[in-house]
Design a protein with these regions (language model features):
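Short, polar loop motifs at secondary-structure junctions
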Residues: 70
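Iron-sulfur (Fe-S) cluster-binding modules
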Residues: 1-46, 52-63, 73-142
């Protein structure tokens, strides 16, 4: 099997101090820990910012999903700058627009609506991975 299809790398934004950034991270945890633990690998954006060679190698070998909390799309931009191939570029705001009843509040700890929004986002990404055949083997956090 081609190693690029063994698992998908998931890179959430690190929007510290922002509710949508917290939703991004929570959705990534939901996806990697609960929904697709055998088909995803979480990678911290900070490793790419620091130029970590193992992180860059991981991106070069596997397709990537980015989850961004704001319109700056830092996770997506950094993955592309680091040589990665983004197969799904998700913006928390786009998911929120479809689910306005799930308004996230809180930073260190999301409210119930924020957690539900993260779950909805994670489920959408999981379905996308299933459709592309990217949620097969391997799971861990980097």
């Amino acid at each position: 099997m081609n190693s690029s299809k063994e698992f998908a790398v998931v890179v959430p934004c690190s929007g510290i101090g922002k509710s949508f950034g917290a939703v991004s991270r929570e959705a990534a945890y939901e996806l990697c820990d609960e929904l697709r633990p055998n088909g995803t690998r979480l990678l911290a954006l900070a490793k790419l910012v620091l130029g970590d060679s193992e992180a860059r190698e991981l991106l070069a070998e596997h397709r990537t999903v980015t989850i961004d909390g704001c319109k700056q799309m830092c996770a997506s931009k950094m993955v592309k700058q680091s040589g990665g191939t983004v197969i799904n570029e998700v913006a928390v705001m786009d998911v929120f627009r479809r689910h306005k009843e799930l308004k996230p509040e809180g930073i260190a700890k999301l409210n119930e609506s924020g957690l539900k929004l993260a779950r909805v986002l994670a489920e959408e990404v999981a379905a996308s991975l299933d459709a592309t055949g990217s949620s097969m083997k391997g799971s861990s956090h980097e």
